[in-house]
């Protein structure tokens, strides 16, 4: 318990860079944790929480994924620093942890940039359909929301959420959804007592899309 208290005091030291503190704390907590579970889940959870507060929640989540995919490198860093011949020097672990964090940041940036490019692609298609009078503004807003949800969350959206985001009545939202469904722009599924909606990205990106409305 005293060692854990010292670790927490270490985190409060403003003279040390925050990311270095988090990296060192991750090792120290895993080393002294009296209920250590053998795979560092607790340490990674705490570190992700600290990174969320210091940087970004998406990066914190991505770090857990990166560690999982580089688990041998992660464990090796522990082994090197745990070796008595290392004489308590945890630099190797701190550097390794920061490398994993940097990799997480790079991967996340690449992923978001790619998704943003895709969103711009579909948004351009939607704007073209508006200009060609295929879609009105309300339909365009609805399908753009569904595109964002499909790309960034990869889930279906219920009508109540759509109604709130569109700032329309239930009746108006139903009409919008029905019109988009008739244009083959929606993918609809049923979950218990409600329908769920997603954008039909294949239909949007089809080269022959506008022919469907001739």
Whereabouts are the PLM-identified features?
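Phosphate/pyrophosphate-binding active-site loops
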Residues: 1-112
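Hydrophobic, well-ordered secondary-structure elements that form the walls
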Residues: 97, 162, 173
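Short alpha-helical segments that sit at the start of domains
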Residues: 112-145
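Short helix-to-turn junction characteristic of helix-turn-helix DNA-binding domains
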Residues: 146-150
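Short acidic, hydrophobic short linear motifs in intrinsically disordered regions
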Residues: 152-165
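Short amphipathic alpha-helical interaction segments
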Residues: 167-182
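Short, cationic-aromatic polyanion-contact patches
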Residues: 188-213
């Amino acid at each position: 318990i005293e060692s854990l208290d010292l670790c927490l005091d270490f985190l409060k030291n403003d003279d040390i860079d925050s990311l270095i503190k988090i990296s060192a704390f991750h090792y120290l907590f895993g080393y002294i944790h009296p209920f250590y579970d053998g795979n560092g889940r607790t340490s990674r959870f705490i570190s992700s929480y600290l990174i969320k507060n210091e940087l970004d929640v998406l990066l914190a989540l991505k770090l857990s994924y990166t560690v999982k995919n580089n688990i041998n490198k992660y464990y090796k860093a522990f082994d090197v620093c745990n070796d008595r011949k290392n004489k308590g020097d945890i630099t190797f672990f701190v550097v390794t942890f920061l490398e994993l964090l940097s990799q997480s940041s790079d991967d996340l940036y690449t992923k978001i940039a790619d998704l943003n490019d895709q969103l711009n692609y579909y948004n351009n298609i939607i704007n073209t359909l508006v200009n060609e009078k295929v879609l009105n503004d309300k339909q365009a807003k609805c399908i753009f929301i569904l595109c964002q949800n499909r790309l960034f969350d990869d889930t279906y959206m219920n009508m109540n959420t759509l109604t709130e985001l569109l700032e329309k009545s239930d009746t108006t939202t139903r009409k919008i959804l029905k019109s988009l469904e008739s244009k083959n722009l929606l993918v609809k599924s049923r979950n218990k007592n409600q329908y769920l909606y997603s954008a039909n990205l294949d239909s949007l990106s089809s080269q022959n899309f506008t022919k469907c409305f001739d």
